[in-house]
């Protein structure tokens, strides 16, 4: 196993995405020094060999290596594939929308991972619960009762965010909705494997973990959105497995401060305040940033329950 220098920085590049996403990520690397040495690897999902070679040439100044994956499965499965091939000492995984916001961002994550007793670190975490949401949306007893808007309005707010993420491409929007609906149909069969609120989980948009620890976890194949839900926020999620090993799962803010799972809400990184503590942004944090008061209240309560504390813009579309 390679144990040299800094972490292996793995960025998920999808051929199906807007190419500006990869360009924006590379520009962030140029503009915001990571604060530590790193090995950059593009996990190139759905690229042909010719397309991959062209992309790597275009980004030659940031010195990336590339590994091509078929356009199937979801992000976590690709990350596990990279780790299996490279076997580096530690990794920082970023999804396609990952956008570092401050200088020294990678050094802050890496320093947190090296703290005694820490097993996994992330730029954001959440307590949001899919089972509690499903119960609430069906007018059943739920921890969200009295905290979220009435179910019809809450469902409309979620749908608006999904459509926003899909963009103006109607086909992409339809595909996104079909994937979401299929996952929701499958979830009742998996409900016992998911956690009710508070379902502590580090979000996998930007996280770090060592290879040795990754090998100790039970990692199933990620074929569907349901598989991804289970690994990110289920009873046997990455976060829960790490915690059961007696290791901390922490969120790191832009100042480098570290928060254990009981205090993630104080980090001001995800759907809280103005997200002023956020170290690495993504499309979900952007949905909150651009949202009006109604959306911000909904997202903050969904993630943090009674500890929700959104900053509400005076005038902004919801």
Kindly give the residue locations of the regions a language model identified.
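Short, flexible, basic/aromatic active-site loop/helix in glycosyltransferases
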Residues: 142-199
């Amino acid at each position: 196993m390679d144990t040299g220098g800094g972490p292996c920085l793995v960025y998920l590049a999808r051929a199906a995405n807007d190419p500006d996403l990869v360009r924006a990520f590379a520009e962030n690397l140029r503009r915001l020094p990571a604060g530590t040495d790193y090995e950059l690897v593009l996990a190139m999902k759905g690229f042909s060999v010719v397309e991959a070679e062209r992309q790597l040439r275009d980004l030659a100044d940031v010195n990336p290596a590339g590994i091509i994956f078929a356009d199937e499965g979801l992000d976590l499965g690709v990350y596990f594939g990279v780790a299996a091939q490279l076997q580096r000492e530690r990794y920082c995984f970023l999804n396609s929308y990952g956008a570092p916001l401050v200088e020294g961002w990678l050094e802050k994550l890496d320093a947190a991972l090296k703290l005694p007793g820490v097993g996994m670190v992330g730029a954001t975490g959440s307590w949001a619960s899919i089972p509690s949401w499903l119960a609430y949306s069906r007018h059943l007893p739920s921890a969200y009762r009295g905290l979220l808007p009435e179910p019809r309005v809450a469902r409309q707010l979620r749908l608006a965010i999904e459509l926003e993420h899909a963009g103006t491409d109607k086909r992409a929007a339809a595909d996104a909705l079909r994937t979401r609906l299929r996952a929701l149909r499958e979830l009742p069969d998996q409900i016992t494997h998911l956690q009710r609120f508070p379902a502590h989980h580090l979000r996998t948009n930007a996280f770090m973990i060592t290879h040795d620890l990754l090998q100790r976890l039970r990692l199933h194949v990620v074929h569907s959105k349901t598989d991804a839900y289970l690994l990110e926020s289920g009873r046997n999620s990455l976060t829960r497995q790490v915690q059961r090993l007696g290791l901390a799962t922490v969120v790191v803010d832009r100042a480098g401060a570290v928060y254990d799972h009981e205090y993630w809400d104080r980090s001001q990184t995800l759907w809280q305040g103005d997200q002023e503590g956020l170290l690495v942004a993504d499309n979900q944090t952007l949905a909150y940033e651009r949202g009006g008061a109604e959306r911000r209240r909904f997202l903050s309560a969904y993630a943090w329950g009674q500890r929700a504390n959104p900053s509400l813009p005076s005038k902004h579309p919801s």
